[in-house]
Every structure is written in C-alpha cells, then in structure tokens.
Swiss-Prot record:
GO terms for molecular function: IMP cyclohydrolase activity; phosphoribosylaminoimidazolecarboxamide formyltransferase activity. Residues 1-148 form the MGS-like domain. The gene is purH. The keyword Transmembrane does not apply. PANTHER family: BIFUNCTIONAL PURINE BIOSYNTHESIS PROTEIN ATIC, BIFUNCTIONAL PURINE BIOSYNTHESIS PROTEIN PURH. Pathway: Purine metabolism; IMP biosynthesis via de novo pathway; 5-formamido-1-(5-phospho-D-ribosyl)imidazole-4-carboxamide from 5-amino-1-(5-phospho-D-ribosyl)imidazole-4-carboxamide (10-formyl THF route): step 1/1; Purine metabolism; IMP biosynthesis via de novo pathway; IMP from 5-formamido-1-(5-phospho-D-ribosyl)imidazole-4-carboxamide: step 1/1. GO terms for biological process: 'de novo' IMP biosynthetic process. Belongs to the PurH family. Its EC number is 2.1.2.3, 3.5.4.10. This is Bifunctional purine biosynthesis protein PurH. NCBIfam families: PRK00881.1, purH. The IMP cyclohydrolase activity resides in the N-terminal region. Keywords: Hydrolase, Multifunctional enzyme, Purine biosynthesis, Transferase. GO terms for cellular component: cytosol. It comes from Aliivibrio fischeri (strain ATCC 700601 / ES114) (Vibrio fischeri).
Length: 530
C-alpha cells in the first residue's frame, strides 16, 4: 500500500522567517497552493509568490490585533480531515484539504529573556493558533505534513522531488514527532515562566528564592549522541544537550578527530573545561575520574601543561586535558610524545596541532570556542524518585573578599597561591584538599570522608612524585571542624591555609594556625562538590 501523500495545498504562518521565502517559492514552483496569514503573507506576496490570505479563504477577518487568525473550522477541518473518511462532510462545508502546515511559534523565550520584559509583553507572545495548528497537523500525520523547523525545508523539497511531489508516512511521522517536541518545549517554557510567580499574581521577583524555582520543573534537551554504554558497560546511555546552549562547553564542542566520546569522557571533559575556565592566565587542567589531578599556570600553555603533568604523571595517564588557550603545535607534540590521553579540549586548535594529533587516531580532539562569561542556570542531580535542583556554583572570591584571621599575614606569593588553589579546590570532589606553590598543584586529596585523610593523601601524592610540600599553600573546600587538620598540615610543611571558615571551633582552628606560625585566610564561601 502506497502511504505517500501528495502536497497540493500548504498553510504557512511563521514567526521565525528564516528560509521561508525560498521554501515557499520552491513549493509554489511545484504547484502547491499557499495559504498564509499576517506578516508571513505580506512577505511572500512582496517576493512575488502567489498567496491566499487565510481570512479570504475562511471569509472571516483577522481580529483582536491578530489574536484570532487561524482558529476557524475551515482551517482546522482542512488539517484534521481524514482522507477517505471525512471527504463528504468537508465538501459539504466548503472545507479544502490542507496537506502541509508550516508553522513556528511566537518567540516567547526570546521575549521573556529581554531586560524589562513585563507580564503583558510575555502574555502577548503566548501563541494560541500556532500550537493548535501544529498539534492538529501532527495528530493527523497519516495524511498531513507538519514542518516546524527551518532546517527541514530542504529535506522536504528533496523528498517531494524524488517522490512525485509527495511525502512518505515515515517522513510525516518523523516531522510529527518533532512538532510535538516543539510544542512541549514551548508549553514548558511558559509554565516555567509563570511558575516563578506562584503564589501571587505579578512580575517575577528576581532574587526571590521562593519564586526562583517554578512549581513544576520543565526542561527539554535534544539527543546529540547514542553511546555504546554508560558509566558502566551494563548501562545504556545517550547524551542530550540544550536546544541553544550559549556558553562554550563540552555540549557545544566540535570533535575534530578521534573515537566517539564515551559517557565518562563527556563527564570528565566537562569537569576539566569548567575548571580551566576559572583562570585568566594560560592554564592547563588534567582530570581523571572527574577530579583534577594536575593544574598549573604558565607563560604559555606548553609550560602550563608541563607543570600540570608533573603533579601526578601516574593519574594523568588516560586522562582528559583542557586548556584555556589555542592548542598549538609545540604543546600537541609534548602531549602525544609523553603520555596516553583520552581527550584534549581547547577553545581552538591550530592547523599544525591538528596534523600532529592526527598521528594518534583514537585521541579525541575537541574545539569548544572562546568563552567570555558563564551563563546562569541550574544544576540538576537525580535522586530516586526526584530531582535536586540548584543554581550553578558560579561563586568565586577575589582578593578583596578574603579575610586574614591569623596573626601572621600571608606573603604576596602565598596570597597568589591561595587564590590559585582555591579555584582548583572548587572542582575537586569533597572532602577536597589542594596543596599548591608557584601556580602549580603539588598534591590533591579528593573524595575522602575525612578532611584530615584528604590532606594526608595530598601529601602522599606529592611525596610520591618528589614534590616539596614545605612552603606550600593548602586550600580546603569547606571549614575545618577541628584543629587536627591544621596540625597535620603544619607537620607537612604548609605555611598558609585558605578555607571558608564557619566552624563552631573556628577559634581553636585559628589558634592552631597561630601556634604553627601559619597564615590563615577565610573566604566566607564553601565549595562542596559531590
């Protein structure tokens, strides 16, 4: 049975007019009659395309400043009418079959994102007729084609040319799924926007914690990649991304070469890239199992890489390397000659570096683009039966935010190192301890249930690599509940500690620092990472 349906009449009404003139022209050239509304009809007519206004077809004018345009039985009957079943009643009421609906919706998201957007502005950008037509056409995909994305225009024309001006059921069904996804996303955005106004009517109060999180949490992501497996081989997995991510990230990165990214590759690459973004100077971050195992600054990224690698060469094997400058030939050579690496990610990659890395055909090389600022948003963590939703941790202190609580003031070099290792500690799994000196990590203790043991591990790591802890700065992602961590740090040779403060025993901890002649800095900000 032939399931193809010829396209003889199309209704076109779009807010985003990207490519619509060319698409409508192509349809007209293939004998398709075009119905249209408002601005779309005017644009097509101006371009010399024959168009019938919907109001002329229905005999009912657009009204209420365009609020009512397509909500008419002659429109929806033409879209919803089942071919071979509803033909008689359609003819009886003068309803012509509409074979294709081309619609995208009012720009609600763009409107509410604008500074100064009022509730009235938002309300006027809630599309009613558009989603109704989209859902009607998608529901009747057995006979009708729905097109909501401009990137499908060429595909539709190509299939019409290859199939006697018809489209197959497989294509119509695929486009219908895209249409339902489109309206689901649209309604989700509206629900989220109004959900922030609960419980009272009015404008969203920015900064009001009660209204920041809507009553229902609606998010939509597009599948970018199916994976061989997830975190473990018995788990199925896929990678989904936001529809239009604004910030340079692993989600937006272009893969230049290498094997397909695995679940763990993506998680680790995200950790490495987000860490390296914290630094303005040329920086390198090496990550293993979502923890930085080596971080350093340098006069260029080659020096930064060399120093980061020295922190923990053993853990760096099979790791992820992120840079905040273009990957150049010298650095690419150093990496490929020195170690096995799973992924390298950088804002850009030189032509020479691409050629060098090509010798390691399995090495995944990613180019993510430049970044300026970090976008706001939510972090989401699944628990059994629910989601934990919070703001992204974009907090970071500057020198002006620091409070020296010890008798001894930190030296200029200690202060610089303190800020450096505080940035690193933010990206180490709690309990996190980082030793650093001269803008280079010396030891990293991650993920221990005891903060003291994280400190011990950082010292063991440093000793194993022949790195000198004496004179280092220590960063702790959260406060020290007892003085034992400071005593252990002093015994290891730590001279300066940076930590959030806030313990009930802060005075005892500060006294311990003073007894050991250490400088102690409070940030007033914690960076738990679980």
């Amino acid at each position: 049975m032939n399931n193809a349906r010829p396209i003889r009449r199309a209704l076109i009404s779009v807010s985003d007019k990207t490519g619509i003139v060319e698409f409508a022209q192509a349809l007209a050239e293939r004998g398709v009659d075009i119905l249209s509304t408002g601005g779309t009809a005017r644009l097509l007519a101006e371009k010399g395309i024959s168009v019938t206004e919907v109001s002329d077809y229905t005999g009912f004018p657009e009204m209420m400043d365009g609020r009512v345009k397509t909500l008419h039985p002659k429109v929806h009957g033409g879209v919803l009418g089942r071919r071979g079943q509803d033909d008689d009643i359609m003819e009886q009421h003068g309803i012509n079959p509409i074979d294709m609906v081309v619609v995208n919706l009012y720009p609600f998201a763009e409107t509410v994102a604008k500074e100064g957007c009022t509730l009235a502005d938002a309300v006027e950008n809630i599309d009613i007729g558009g989603p109704t037509m989209v859902r009607s056409a998608a529901k009747n995909h057995k006979d009708v084609t729905i097109v909501v994305n401009a990137h499908d225009y060429d595909r539709v024309i190509a299939e019409m040319d290859a199939n006697e001006k018809s489209l197959t059921l497989e294509t119509r069904f695929d486009l219908a799924i895209a249409a339902f996804e489109h309206t689901a996303s649209y309604d989700g955005m509206i629900a989220n926007y109004f959900g922030t106004m609960v419980p009272s009517y009015g404008e969203n109060k920015e900064g009001d914690e009660e209204s920041k999180f809507p009553r229902t949490f609606n998010q939509q992501f597009e599948k970018k990649q199916d994976m061989r497996y997830g975190e473990n081989s018995h788990q199925a997995a896929a990678f989904y991304v936001e529809a239009n991510p604004e910030e340079a990230s692993v989600s937006t990165a272009r893969q230049i070469q290498g094997k397909a990214l695995s679940y763990n590759n993506i998680a680790d690459t995200d950790a490495a890239l987000e860490c390296v973004k914290e630094f303005d100077e040329p920086a390198c971050v090496i990550v293993k199992h979502a923890n930085p195992c080596g971080v350093a600054l340098g006069k260029d990224i080659l020096e930064a890489y060399d120093r980061a690698f020295k922190t923990d060469p053993t853990s760096a094997f099979g790791g992820i390397i992120a840079f905040n400058r273009e990957l150049d030939a010298a650095t690419a050579t150093a990496i490929t000659e020195r170690q096995f690496v799973e992924v390298i990610i950088a804002p850009s990659v030189s032509t020479e570096a691409v050629e060098i890395v090509a010798a390691k055909k399995n090495l995944r090389l990613l180019e993510c683009g430049e970044w300026t600022t970090k976008t706001t948003g939510f972090d989401v963590k699944r628990v059994n039966g629910g989601l934990l939703v919070q703001d992204r941790d974009q907090g970071m202190v500057s020198e002006d935010d620091l409070q020296v609580v010890s008798k001894r003031q930190p030296t200029a070099e200690e202060l610089k190192d303190a800020l450096f290792c505080w940035k690193v500690a933010k990206y180490v799994k709690s309990n996190a301890i980082v030793y650093s000196k001269g803008d280079m990590t010396i030891g990293v203790g991650a993920g221990q249930m005891s903060r003291v043991y994280s400190a011990k591990i950082a010292g063991i790591k440093a000793a194993d690599e022949g790195l000198q802890v004496e004179g280092c700065v220590m960063a702790s992602d959260a406060f020290f509940p007892f003085r034992d961590g400071i005593d252990a740090a002093a015994e290891a040779g730590i001279k300066c500690v940076i930590q959030p403060g806030g313990s009930m025993r802060d005075n005892e901890v500060i006294e311990a620092a003073d007894e050991h002649g250490m400088a102690m800095i409070f940030t007033g900000m914690r960076h738990f990472r679980h």
